[in-house]
Amino acid sequence: MEELLLIRQPSVAYADQIAEYRKEFLEYGGSMDGTGPLRRIEDPHEYIRYCQECEDPARVPAHLVPATQFLLVRKNDDKLLGMLQVRHYFNDYLEKYAGHIGYSIRPSERRKGYAKKMLKMALPYCREIGLEKVLILCVDGNTGSEKTILANGGIYESTVHEPDRNVDLKRYWISL
């Protein structure tokens, strides 16, 4: 059985792979959920510094909330497979349209069950930071993400429309 590692806080050791992850998503054209500002930050070292700042409540930019960035890595070849971000609490936008957790699996590694495993591995951390339940949203029609959430105990709450992206989002809660 394949061993996976969930690594808290990206490090310089993964800078090249973070750049490759970003490039793969930009070429694919998909959403980079759970990566914070990776789409707009080209330099992986700058991205790593940004992630470190966001975990520290004293250093997080004023319009954001503290968040912890995780990398999902396959142990046998040390390949970066996915990213997941845990937001420690809500602001208005997160409560309505993003939730506590965002995640993505690189396009070339999808449909292998990695998202389900990555989410499961992240839930104990959510308990550690004091959350009793987590809100996760997915675009209506994203059956892969919906299956991932349901497999981890997600309970459907409602569907909301996000006007900025003009999409409907399904809201799920997972009790910890």
Q: Could you tell me what each predicted segment is?
A:
Residues 136-146:
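Conserved beta-strand-loop-alpha-helix junction that forms the acyl-donor binding cleft
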Residues 102-105, 111-124, 128, 147-151:
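Conserved acetyl-CoA-binding loop-helix of GNAT-fold acetyltransferases
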Residues 137-138, 153-171:
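Conserved catalytic-core motifs of GNAT/GCN5-like acyltransferases
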Residues 126-137:
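Conserved GNAT acetyl-CoA-binding A-motif
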Residues 72, 131, 159-162:
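Catalytic cores of nucleotide-sugar-dependent glycosyltransferases that transfer UDP/GDP/TDP-activated
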Residues 89-91, 108, 141:
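Short coil/turn motifs at secondary-structure junctions
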Residues 102, 106, 139, 162:
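Residue-level recognition of the GNAT/N-acetyltransferase active site
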Residues 1-100, 168-176:
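GNAT-family acyltransferases
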